[in-house]
Amino acid sequence: MMRGIDSRHELDPTLLLRDTRTFTQRLADFFADPTNISIVLISLAAVSYYFSEAATFLLIMGGIFFLYSYTRKQKLPFRLPQISRAKDYNDLKPGINKPNIARGITFFGNDRKTGEELWFANDDMRTHALIFGSTGSGKTETLVSLSYNALVQGSGFIYVDGKGDNSLYAKVFSMVRSMGREDDLLLINFMTGARDIVGPQEKRLSNTLNPFCQGSSSMLTQLVVSLMGSSGQSSDGDMWKGRAIAFVEALMRLLVYMRDEGAILLDANTIRNYFDLQRLESIVIDKVFPRDDQESVNIETIPKLVTDPLRNYLNTLPGYNKEKKGKQVSQVLEQHGFITMQLVRSFSSLADTYGHIIRTNLAEVDFKDVVLNRRILVVLLPALEKSPDELSNLGKIIVSSLKAMMAAGLGEEVEGDYRDVILRKPTNAPTPYMCILDEYGYYAVQGFAVVPAQARSLGFSAIFAGQDLPAFQKASKEEAASIGANTNIKICMKLEDPTETWDFFTKTAGEAYVTKVDSFQTKETSIANSYMDTKSSSFEKRARVDLLDLKEQTEGEAHIFFKSKIVRARMFYANPKPVKQLKINQFLKVEPPPDDYLMKLQKQLASFQSILESGDLSINKAVENEEITLISKALKESTIVEPIERGVAALIAFHGQNEPEPVEDIVEEEVEGALTIFSKLRIDPNAPPILVADKEVFSEPLLPINETRNQMITIERLAGAKDKYAGTVANELIKDFQIATSYPPEERDVIDVQELTGIIRDLSAKISAEREKANKKAAEELT
């Protein structure tokens, strides 16, 4: 026996509802639909054809119906498309309640019931969107289709995929290729195919990204802190994490300074190498900055503000004694080890596993460039290859870098011209920059919930997507609640979570009063024992959405919640056509020009601009040049009338006047018992034979004297010197080469032993005195 309810016993809830509106309200609603009025007008025309007597009356009625329908305010569920240029009565100006001109720029899909288009304006998109949908709901296709809006607008987007599916890159590449913007496409692919990436690969896997190559020390510190593991609930864990954060802040202050000075390439591996206590001691005590595979750098002249944090860190290590440099007791090493071990895991993953992406100087992906120049960035996170914690760290790198870029875009100035401080923000654009975070729960970052609140003024449109609400709550329930509260556009696709996610959408939708039939009664005269309602109704409060409706949605169907409206929608499906060949952009690394060159260029451009503004483009400055003077004189004195022949004659005369005197070849004089760099090998006949294949070539001088002289003349000529002067300089240089490489050297001044000993003692005394002064100075700084 089955006690559950069979489907044939289930009632359609809409059959219990009754329309209690007045006749005029229903009539007005009927004629508000253009399809209905079209049917009425066609019907009136057909009736007038058969009943010509009523044609005049029917014409008047048709005109009234048409005018009524024509004068109705045309609306769509959300916004009218901008191309319509009509007044949008769903988009009223605040305070005066006058309609804005249509501003819809982002197409979401169509109403499933009426087929009406669903558009959102720039301001709406910058209030962000939240999408939930279970597996197979069409969530990824919806997000890809939304990103196509950005391409149509000439904008760009960032798409972070927590599932790590390479088919996503293929779809995005197809869309970008169709718009002719494949040069703007960037890919960060953390997927390694379950193998180690060592050395060059046959095919490129990813563009490069180095989050440490730019940004302030505080921004990079926060990035590292976000990668650190949770300290747990213990107070000891909080204490050790706090000390680790203090160490990172102190270290980053110095490393960022040295990076900006061009002394080091700052990446994850470089930072990890400076965890060594001996290196820290060299920096603080010896005032020497050690570098990997390079000479150390003297840092005595850098500001104390940069080195003081590291000095204070060492001084606060329990048991640390600066007098025992390099030989600290085990307690100091343990204390330092407890601090650095909290950082090793994150940096090992970045520097080793993903070194082919992170360990680079001029990275191809610069988030500031990506956002300001509206590029397209796709990030693939390996959900199957990595543990949840590791996957979270990779996502945090992207999200934290994006957050830091947003912080820089907010600006720090509050004083100055309004146009410079406010209107010239780098992201004031008529279209939003989309940040699509698919499966955000896998890589949620603590503190990212403030982004929806701040990103609106920066022109960002953050679209959070996931399968359910509990995934968002892994990082923090408060963060998840804040994201839900700060996203005005909420979309629920196929839903299978009947608990927290369902409660979230139920509360979002709210309740409404409806009129329902009270009861049914049997019709006494009916043989089939049919039921009829009792012609009475009452109202009750019901939820505006039903869980079964959300569960029965097919791929691409969704409920869209915006303000107080709920629209059952069929989402836009871009369906990009696959391309035959996929590729990853490869860029040429070019160092930025130095600051002094930029200042010089700016002055030159300013001077050129002032010349253009003055309107006087003539050059009155006399340039003294002997060649130009000679050619000008020859042209003036020439009696030839034909311009071309006169010019040729002037050039021939100039060439004849400036023809260089022939320079004789220099012959190296062979001095017995002496050698120079221009000497040939002289072989003693009695010496053992030289075991070489070609003795003549082997016996040639290291530098042929005449070829060297000719090359020097060429260099001088390229530098602007005349032939005569160039030959003289070359001969002088050849003589200098001969003197400098002459062997045996000439006898030099002889110094006796006592005098040499005295000089050495004086030098030693001066060195000792300088060292004592340096030690006293260091002791005074520490005290």
From Swiss-Prot:
SUPFAM superfamilies on file: P-loop containing nucleoside triphosphate hydrolases
Location in the cell: Cell inner membrane
GO biological process: protein transport
Region (ATPase domain): 100-500
Transmembrane segments: 47-67
Sequence segments annotated as region (Interaction with IcmS/IcmW): 671-773
Short name of one Pfam family: TraG-D_C
UniProt topology in membrane: Single-pass membrane protein
GO CC terms in record: plasma membrane
Keyword Electron transport among record annotations: no
InterPro entries: P-loop_NTPase, T4SS_component, TraG-D_C
Keywords of the record: Cell inner membrane, Cell membrane, Membrane, Protein transport, Transmembrane, Transmembrane helix, Transport, Virulence
CDD domains with a match to the protein in the record: TrwB_TraG_TraD_VirD4
Main location: membrane
Function of the protein: Component of the Dot/Icm type IVB secretion system (T4BSS), which is used to inject bacterial effector proteins into eukaryotic host cells. Part of a subcomplex which recruits effector proteins and delivers them to the core transmembrane subcomplex. Plays a central role in the assembly of the subcomplex. Required for the recruitment of IcmS and IcmW to the inner membrane and for the translocation of adapter-dependent substrates. May have ATPase activity.
PANTHER family: SLR6007 PROTEIN, UNCHARACTERIZED PROTEIN YJGR-RELATED
Subunit: The T4BSS is a complex nanomachine composed of several subcomplexes. This subunit is part of the Type IV Coupling Complex (T4CC), a subcomplex composed of the DotLMNYZ core and the IcmSW-LvgA adapter subunits, linked by the C-terminal tail of DotL. Six DotLMNYZ hetero-pentameric units may assemble into a hexameric nanomachine, forming an inner membrane channel for effectors to pass through. Interacts directly with DotM. Interacts directly, via its C-terminal region, with the type IV adapter proteins IcmS and IcmW. Also interacts with DotN and LvgA via its C-terminal region.
Protein name listed in UniProt: Type 4 coupling protein DotL
Species for this entry: Legionella pneumophila subsp. pneumophila (strain Philadelphia 1 / ATCC 33152 / DSM 7513)
Name of the gene: dotL
